[in-house]
Design a protein with these regions (language model features):
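C-terminal His-loop and adjacent cap/lid subdomain of alpha/beta-hydrolase
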Residues: 1-197
Length: 197
């Protein structure tokens, strides 16, 4: 993809001060500068820029590096269908030595800080709880070669009416051997990520 160019500079504290902060030339100077860096393909600056772009280009190939992607299924800000699920599929297509575990957590969303508020406290569970588990799992993998968990859906239960205290029944652990009905898989023949409901 092409680089993003700011057209309106509105990062003032409290929001944009006035509509006049828009750049009348649609940030042409910045775009032109990037284009001039990229265009002369054989200059040192252009080669360095292209190398940098290639190093971060999204291919999904982690080159066999272990990784855990953890995502709340109820995340409305960063939806799983447009981020983690396709990345998991891209990784499985392009990384023959894949060590990626994808953990999807129903009833978890983007903002754990909101969990004390009415409506959030009865409908969602804390994703941070699973972040801690994922970090421990990765630590154990890196330190003692413990197996990473298979990709899976972790079956959580929201607290419900009155928001009673969380229990282990609400937030079961990431399973080292998930049930077949909870396992996330990739079908290479059809290039399809299969996510249990």
């Amino acid at each position: 993809g092409s680089p993003t160019i700011a057209v309106i500079y509105n990062n003032a504290q409290g929001g944009p001060v006035t509509h006049t902060v828009a750049n009348g030339d649609f940030a042409f100077a910045g775009a032109d500068c990037l284009r001039q860096l990229w265009s002369p393909a054989q200059t040192a600056a252009a080669l360095a820029l292209r190398q940098g772009v290639n190093e971060v280009k999204l291919t999904g190939n982690l080159r066999g590096k272990p990784a855990i992607v953890l995502h709340g299924r109820s995340d409305a800000l960063v939806p799983v269908n447009h981020t983690s699920r396709p990345y998991f599929g891209l990784n499985k297509l392009n990384d023959p030595a894949s060590k990626l575990s994808y953990i999807e957590v129903p009833n978890a969303q983007h903002f754990d800080a909101f969990l004390s508020l009415g409506g959030y406290n009865t409908s969602f569970i804390p994703l941070h709880y699973y972040t801690q588990q994922a970090l421990e799992l990765m630590w154990n993998h890196l330190r003692s070669n413990a197996a990473l968990p298979p990709s899976q859906v972790v079956r959580t239960t929201p607290r419900g009416s009155g928001a009673p205290d969380l229990t282990a029944a609400n937030v079961p652990p990431i399973a080292s051997t998930p049930a077949a009905a909870d396992t996330i898989t990739f079908d290479a023949a059809t290039r399809t990520v299969k996510i249990p409901d």
